[in-house]
């Protein structure tokens, strides 16, 4: 866990360490520690992760990204979708089923790919995978 604010132009540098987690809930803990150390709440959803990136400007260094890519890959994503389908409301079961089918067909995104997409959707953030 590391957040460095001493870079040029007051840009920040945040480090997400893949060695600190092996599943999505561990990822949420890691990013909560990195980005929200002084807050009363923790990230617990993909939308919540997206929300905490607003206002952050700088670079995110994701160490051991290959480990995270495997940990948050096909199997973890399949279980993630199956749990949402099983839970039902408030989730749109048809949409989640479609996402699961796309994943199984090899055209859907894994959790790792979704997280990368979320980070890259913020133009003020540079992502570095190590």
Segments from the language model and where they lie:
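Positively charged, polar, low-complexity stretches
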Residues: 1-130
């Amino acid at each position: 866990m590391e957040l460095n604010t001493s870079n040029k132009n007051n840009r920040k540098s945040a480090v997400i360490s893949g060695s600190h987690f092996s599943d999505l809930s561990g990822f949420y803990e890691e990013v909560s520690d990195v980005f929200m150390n002084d807050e009363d709440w923790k990230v617990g959803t993909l939308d919540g992760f997206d929300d905490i990136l607003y206002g952050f400007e700088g670079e995110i260094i994701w160490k051991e990204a290959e480990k995270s890519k495997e940990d948050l890959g096909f199997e973890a994503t399949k279980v993630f979708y199956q749990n949402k389908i099983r839970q039902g409301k408030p989730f749109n079961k048809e949409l989640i089923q479609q996402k699961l089918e796309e994943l199984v067909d090899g055209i859907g995104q894994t959790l790792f790919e979704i997280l990368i997409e979320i980070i890259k959707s913020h133009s003020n953030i540079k992502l570095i995978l190590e």
